Amino acid sequence: MKKRVIGFAVAALAVGCATAALQPMPAGKLPDPTGLAINKGREIAFVNPLPRMRCGKVQCGTYNNWELAFPGVLTTAGADFGNALWSLRKVVWADRRLVFVDGRTLVCQLNWIRDHIHQMKGYRHWEYDLTSFLDFILDTQRADGQFYELIKQLDDFHWTFVPPDCRILYPEDNQSLVRLELEADIEYLMVEGCLQAWRVTGDDAWLRRALPRLEKGIDYMTRDPKRWDAAHGLCKRPYTIDTWDFTNDPRSGGNRSVVLTEPMAIMHGDNSGVYQAMNQLAWINERFGNAAKAASWRARAEALKANMFKHLWNGTFFCHQLPLNCEPLDAHEKERLSLSMAYALNRDILTTEQKRGVVAEYKARRKTTKGFSEWFTIDPAYSPSFKGNPPGRYVNGALSPFTAGELAKGAFECGEEAYGWDILDRVAKMVKRDDGKLYFLYDPVTGQPQGGGPSAWGAAAVLSAVDEGLAGVQDLDVQYRKIRFAPRWAVTPFAEGRYLTGYEASHKTVDVRWIFTDKGFRYHLRSPAQTVQAHLLVPSGKTPKALRVNGREMAFVLSTVGESRYVDAAVTPQDGVADFEVFY
């Protein structure tokens, strides 16, 4: 009987389902953007709330919104640029590692502190452990101030390339801690890395503990006979290609030590890096109330800068290497453009006009190079080869996204905004062509990837160029308490969009909306900032007549950088919002 009742009920339900038609749901209707709170009281209204999948017939977003990340962008013109940023983030994510050594667990972007710090320009936005690797390098600093740089398993024989005082072995972990002695960039990179990490965490106590060790590292670079050339007042290194870790001597593959009787030279990138570090140390000391120390570091920085321009400047850019105890490898050192020149654009050592001259040199060489771009590791390359690498191979002339990123960022700051965007656009198209990949180096003629290093290094540089150059969001203090806001979306095809950045680890978000119209343009900035230094690029051919901030008219300064014009104003946000309307 029980079975018959259940069977009857199921049968009746089936009949009901077969005969009853589903009623259509009411048609969906999107809200009128003019009625949104973000447009209340504003004359220039945002038209398309973002994120969205389509703007009319244009697919402008993805189904699950992978554009929404730090940093991320959505535009009404299409999804390609947002997809490119997503792909670049994945390239950086792929280098994340854990290293287990001496009872510690370290989060590393690869096992080299150099790569870790260069890649921090990207991953600082989402990583939650920014200090474990830095702490290990700080804690193992040598008594004279030298830092170690890489952790490798013992059967990777990097530890055999250096003298005993440049290595520590951890046999229980089968690991080695090594300093390739001929490298001359680690001490200044540690200053940069610790400052970047602190901006995210806001941990003043941590930075105070690190500060004496960072200062000791720069003192070592500017005093030790292996590092410092007293006659020129500049840092020196063995005669390498730019910042790389081998010389033209075939023996340098297995011996990476500094031997002062071997060819030595002064490379500009080591010195612009130390100059930047000195100014960063001055800024940190000033923040902590050490005015005398801050003044001393600034004075040392200016002396170093003066020596750089006296001995290395060729009138347009810094020459590659100044040989000290040997003849130049060829006749082209004074005209050789090396990758550290792109970095120098962003180390505050050049005036605006000097930056423009450097950018002009890259643009001119783009027209004459046989390669597909001007993103040189070095140009001209050494011929017939450098330690077995012919022209165009590895750092002897291959093309690099890290040069592209630094060059683009520098271009945005010196009135070459359209060129900066052109570089980013070319990179984005390469990423799309290669199914979301970006490689460490490329053959200049064929465009094929060469490998030889971490792709994330270049991806992070490009992300940084987008974040601080194109989007123009610069953290001037800690956790975005003070922001320089210098967006350059006016040189892109994106008339309306949204940009997101921030620090996941400290739960800080910067959310930017923009739109360009016939009557003017508008930026809506929501952030943790207590003060905002606005520097808003005006579209070419337009003249700004008025500025409103949060609906109220405000005085502004019209500044000029090259041929570009900017609306400048110092603003105190209201409830986390600074809303800029600029009228023509």
Language-model features: locations:
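Sec-dependent N-terminal signal peptides
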Residues: 5-14
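Asp/Glu-centered strand-loop micro-motifs enriched in Gly/Pro and often flanked by an aromatic residue
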Residues: 70-77, 83-113, 117-121
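Aromatic-rich carbohydrate-recognition surfaces in CAZymes
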Residues: 109-237, 267-271, 275, 397-408, ...
